[in-house]
Amino acid sequence: LPYTDLRDWIKQLDKAGELIRIREAVSPYLEMSEIADRTAKLQKGTSKAGGPALLFENVTGHPGARVLMNQFGSERRMKLALDLDKPTDSLDAIADRIRVLIHPETPTSMLDKLKLLPKLAEVGSFFPKLISSRDAACKQVIHRSVEEGGKGIDLLKLPVLTTWPQDGGPFITLPCVVTRDPKTSKRNVGMYRMQVYDGQTTGMHWQRQKVAAEHLRDRLRMATTQSLGAPSIAASSRWVGDTTARVDIMAQTSGGTLPATNPTSIPTTTLTKVREGRMEVAVAIGTDPATTFSAIVPAPPEVEEYLIAGFLRGKPVELVKCETVDLEVPAHAEYILEGFVNLGELRTEGPFGDHTGFYTMEDQYPVFHITCITHRREPIYAATVVGKPPMEDAWMGKAVERIFLPLMQLTLPEIVDVCLPPEAVFHNLMIVAIRKSYAGHARKIMNGIWAMGQAMFTKCVIVVDEDCNVQDLAEVTLRVANNIDPERDIQFTLGPVDSLDHASRLPNFGSKMGIDATRKWPAEGFTRPWPPMLQQAPTVTAKIDALWKKLAIE
């Protein structure tokens, strides 16, 4: 059955023997993260890797608070979260389900159309459902800011974790951040860390290539156009992770294009009006597992995350209107933070101990001003800790990998399988198996990946033949070591890189490497015969299979 909320999920984890309740006093300052880190690395490399989920019930400095961690931290829990608990289930089943959602077969006859109706009806039943505030558990307790007519809010009452010694402060690490496209009014749900500055404000780690950052840039363009009083004015922001942290405005007139200007050359009144503009934001913390997971899924722009969550859990997500902003949030979340980001306002964010295993250093990011906090009675705070792999996000990343496969195959159908090794923190290495059909096919795949959404950040791409199991890193290593001539088969290019990449020559820009480890063809300039790989005779394999147990070797 689908999990209605985080509490249903916790009950299931408890019932399945996947939860440990910690009643010893533990501090959210470094101590919880150390326990979660050690737990995530238990039985590393085995089928039982990841340890149990952790429910802290005695949080130092926060009487009555509870904190859930490592909820996605094992293969079994990741499958449970996505309703895949049969012994024969694997995360590959997620890819099959996603294909139905994003790419139903085109009907070619009336009979095919009739067969498609039940599938369309099923997908239609997963769209989010708006319910009234009185039925929304997240509205059980409401705190409004003084500006909103309330008695005030205090984010510091939440047991937000500081996870590593050099972190810039406590960070909210498992939020579902809701924004709205100012051009289309479509909602987006993403996951971005939030540094807590004080009781009313946080940072918003909106890297420039993320959807929420694009929403803010669009909102900034609109505000700038209105401020300058000319409908032909277009504004572009070079902000989000850019250490210059400036707004460049390009004025277009009938006489041509004016050069970009520094903010200091823009009239003060104009910049003031831009900064006074706002973009509304809402944050849900502690949702059901499918909703939390949907916030990190690389969804096509036309597919809303709430729909994906409903599809994954087999039941629509119930939403409720916010109190102070025009956004809809999961009705049964543990906490809801409502507020706004001021256009043009930036503040230092970081450092932060990141999933790369290194600190992400300080930079300038938008500031989230909270106008209202609503929560359930006796709320449960959900958090994660990232660091040197393997961590909880390794299993979340593996599920994303399985969802990413059918999305890639829409554009590159010759892809057979893909692997994003957690040791390479996902965006640093992608291994791809393809059905090779022509000379240079592997290079076409590399360039296609670097042109595809969030895959553009991939630092290294390895392409192998379809008979290579990309999930077996030993086999991949064998193919790479034996199948390449380094000068011939390694390709370098320049392009955007992840903001977390501390090794790139410039922030957000650097080099990438592609390795063609496929068999080489005469059309690719290989003139010698390509040797066959070793393989035992099938008759011998079958005979020894039947004899193996009797030999008692293992």
Regions found by a protein language model. Give the residues of each.
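Extended, highly charged
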Residues: 1-224, 262, 266-554
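Intrinsic disorder/low-complexity segments
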Residues: 222-269, 273
